Amino acid sequence: MRGPSGALWLLLALRTVLGGMEVRWCATSDPEQHKCGNMSEAFREAGIQPSLLCVRGTSADHCVQLIAAQEADAITLDGGAIYEAGKEHGLKPVVGEVYDQEVGTSYYAVAVVRRSSHVTIDTLKGVKSCHTGINRTVGWNVPVGYLVESGRLSVMGCDVLKAVSDYFGGSCVPGAGETSYSESLCRLCRGDSSGEGVCDKSPLERYYDYSGAFRCLAEGAGDVAFVKHSTVLENTDGKTLPSWGQALLSQDFELLCRDGSRADVTEWRQCHLARVPAHAVVVRADTDGGLIFRLLNEGQRLFSHEGSSFQMFSSEAYGQKDLLFKDSTSELVPIATQTYEAWLGHEYLHAMKGLLCDPNRLPPYLRWCVLSTPEIQKCGDMAVAFRRQRLKPEIQCVSAKSPQHCMERIQAEQVDAVTLSGEDIYTAGKTYGLVPAAGEHYAPEDSSNSYYVVAVVRRDSSHAFTLDELRGKRSCHAGFGSPAGWDVPVGALIQRGFIRPKDCDVLTAVSEFFNASCVPVNNPKNYPSSLCALCVGDEQGRNKCVGNSQERYYGYRGAFRCLVENAGDVAFVRHTTVFDNTNGHNSEPWAAELRSEDYELLCPNGARAEVSQFAACNLAQIPPHAVMVRPDTNIFTVYGLLDKAQDLFGDDHNKNGFKMFDSSNYHGQDLLFKDATVRAVPVGEKTTYRGWLGLDYVAALEGMSSQQCSGAAAPAPGAPLLPLLLPALAARLLPPAL
């Protein structure tokens, strides 16, 4: 008699293996343990394999730890817990819950306002807010996390409750009554009809949960309600509860959108704060997600319909809600991309990052890197001033020899933060992996610290040319090493492949690209003569091409004059230069009769534009300075400290004993921050050095420092550019700052 075939042996072996396996489900409470035991028994009686066992944990966090330690295998978690489990313990989501076929494995967190109001997402500070409950996903975690992550809400020392209580002009946050900020966070709550249960995280508080938070808005207690996408439609147009005392119409409410606009309440797919992922079953990275789904799929096939002996998606028999799975679950589905990032999604991940601040992990000090004796003195005074106001974390001052030395010390975890300019931000990010935590903001009219780099030409229809046709033209530059006059335009032309330096000889390459130029310089040694060919010197013809005002074509005004007087065909200047010297703004004889409409800009796309269209037609925007830190530093804590500090010390006329943005008391300039700074600002979505600097500025820097410098052929479009900085060239010829 022949034995079993190979295929049959494999099947028998697989059944033996599965029969010997078990999935240990982690329960977080006695009622959940009870339901888990019943589910295990139901699965066993139905012959579902592998067998299901129940492990008792004390909380979701404890269960995650048990799974990571291989003492349990699976648990269903909400989005916030999935984020922590994935980020801290490497767990992965494998099975998702479905609640509503319209939105599938997710729902949407929205901010609702009355249509008659003028509130937007950018004007929430000071308004009255209605929340479903403390630490609830839609009513608290998403809106608060989003406001923090987007920079609208600053948090000092991880004290989110205080930050929210200071931000809104009163709130109802059911469950916040036991906190230190209950006066503000419970101010709008009213309890039940007899005034009992005020601010309880239960139905005793009339403004609790989704419908309660919306009622808080509808009755005029609050100005904005943070609820889910279906809440308004479930409580208006004839569905309003009689106890509310009024009939509500959905058309009387609108949603706040992330871009500052508003939309109808039916437009929640396009206008929301975040898509909230459904709960999901998580397991260790080495666990077969397909096996878990097959187990649960067999279970839901038998035990998710009415009349079945066990109800997987009901907790009514146990006197609780949402045990093992949410009671609103209609189906369990397999997750294709089993990473916590993919499951949670971009919007929700960003909101969670805004809340990821553990006071117990917050370092007591923020070590600031300083570069000079005056800066040490100012930093010391800043540390004392912050300490007196109990600002956290406290400041410590650590000296370094140079910006690059600061970067090295930050990377080595010897220092935490330093304020850097554009080129140094590039080096800090690309070479040392640092990221921006906060930025400087200057006055809108301050063109010396925040501006666009533009290429200006005469409006000439008969001899018009584009940026791609600059070879052989005559060029006017503010000076060698000036950001708008040299670094950005030359870098942009190199990056686009028009100028190709050989053996790092940028000067010769530029001199051969243009027919003639005026590029004033301090030290003309080994300087190509054509780069001075258009320069005119002073009125007596002396000091030709020197890197100061004795050369009439020096600086941005001088470069424009070079163009005006027909010495050059193109001038590389700031976007304000034309306006500063035309239409009567400059009374000097050469500029007195000039009109701005007689000039145009050359755009990177090959077009020309009016000089007023500089925001859309420029070579790059010079970025503001930024505070740079290690990527593991909580940037919201850094900004939270600076934001609270500038409320006290940011005004140069404040009476609090220290001026953050003024260096005059220390006999220096731009110490710790540029003196022109009006406010420190959050980085928002610009969380990388490339994001902060902007693509055009980075491209210009990479053009100046790329492999093209060594004579390599221009890369194909989209090819990476390798950094090879040119410190020797800059040190040899760099003139004073322009």
Swiss-Prot record:
Positions of Fe(3+) 2 binding: 421, 451, 556, 625
InterPro entries recorded: Transferrin, Transferrin-like_dom, Transferrin_Fe_BS
Keyword Disulfide bond: yes
List of residues binding Fe(3+) 1: 78, 107, 210, 279
Cellular component aspect of the GO annotation: cell surface; early endosome; endoplasmic reticulum lumen; extracellular exosome; extracellular region; extracellular space; plasma membrane; recycling endosome
Tissues with expression: Found predominantly in human melanomas and in certain fetal tissues; also found in liver, epithelium, umbilical chord, placenta and sweat gland ducts.
UniProt-annotated binding residues for hydrogencarbonate: 132, 136, 138-139
Statement: the UniProt record of this protein carries the keyword Metal-binding: yes
Positions of the propeptide segment: 710-738
Pfam families found in the cross-reference section: Transferrin
Key words, A-Z: Cell membrane, Disulfide bond, Glycoprotein, GPI-anchor, Ion transport, Iron, Iron transport, Lipoprotein, Membrane, Metal-binding, Phosphoprotein, Repeat, Signal, Transport, Zinc
Annotated positions of the Phosphoserine modification: 462
Covalent lipidation (GPI-anchor amidated cysteine), chain numbering: 709
Gene Ontology process terms (BP): iron ion transport; negative regulation of substrate adhesion-dependent cell spreading; positive regulation of extracellular matrix disassembly; positive regulation of plasminogen activation
Carbohydrate-modified residues: 38, 135, 515
Role description: Involved in iron cellular uptake. Seems to be internalized and then recycled back to the cell membrane. Binds a single atom of iron per subunit. Could also bind zinc.
Protein name per its UniProtKB record: Melanotransferrin
Source organism phylogeny: Eukaryota, Metazoa, Chordata, Craniata, Vertebrata
Gene from which this protein is expressed: MELTF
